[in-house]
């Protein structure tokens, strides 16, 4: 999946996450989390799993996490990525 424009998904409310995606030449992930010291590595692993699932190799990803669950992080990242691309959605990869 090629990222062609900037997109945002999520909120800054408690137990949620805001994900910003922008075009870039390499894959850059920035995590700002209220639970980063405890779960930062797990959050990054979740983000990378979604990026691999959707074949994203170049993008700037900024996550403002407020204690979101794994399923919320996955949903927010997928929503932002789909908003940031002009490619047709491959629904089989979304599962």
Swiss-Prot record:
Q: Name one GO cellular component term.
A: cytoplasm
Q: Which organism is it from?
A: Actinobacillus succinogenes (strain ATCC 55618 / DSM 22257 / CCUG 43843 / 130Z)
Q: How does it assemble?
A: Oligomer with a subunit composition of (alpha,beta,gamma)6.
Which residues are reported to carry the modification O-(phosphoribosyl dephospho-coenzyme A)serine? 14
Protein name, please?
A: Citrate lyase acyl carrier protein
What family is it from?
Answer: Belongs to the CitD family.
Where mainly found? Answer: cytoplasm
Its annotated function is as follows:
Covalent carrier of the coenzyme of citrate lyase.
Q: Decide whether keyword Phosphoprotein is in the record.
A: yes
Keywords attached to this Swiss-Prot or TrEMBL record, sorted alphabetically, are: Cytoplasm, Phosphoprotein
Protein localization: Cytoplasm
Which Pfam families does this UniProt record tie to the protein? ACP
């Amino acid at each position: 999946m090629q990222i062609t424009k900037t997109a945002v998904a999520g909120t800054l409310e408690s137990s949620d996450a805001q994900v910003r995606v922008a075009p870039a030449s390499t894959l850059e992930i920035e995590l700002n989390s209220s639970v980063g010291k405890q779960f930062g590595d797990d959050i990054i692993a979740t983000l990378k799993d979604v990026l691999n699932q959707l074949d994203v190799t170049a993008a700037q990803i900024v996550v403002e996490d407020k204690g979101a669950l794994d399923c919320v992080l996955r949903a927010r990242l997928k929503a932002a990525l789909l908003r940031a691309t002009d490619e047709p959605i491959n629904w089989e990869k979304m599962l």
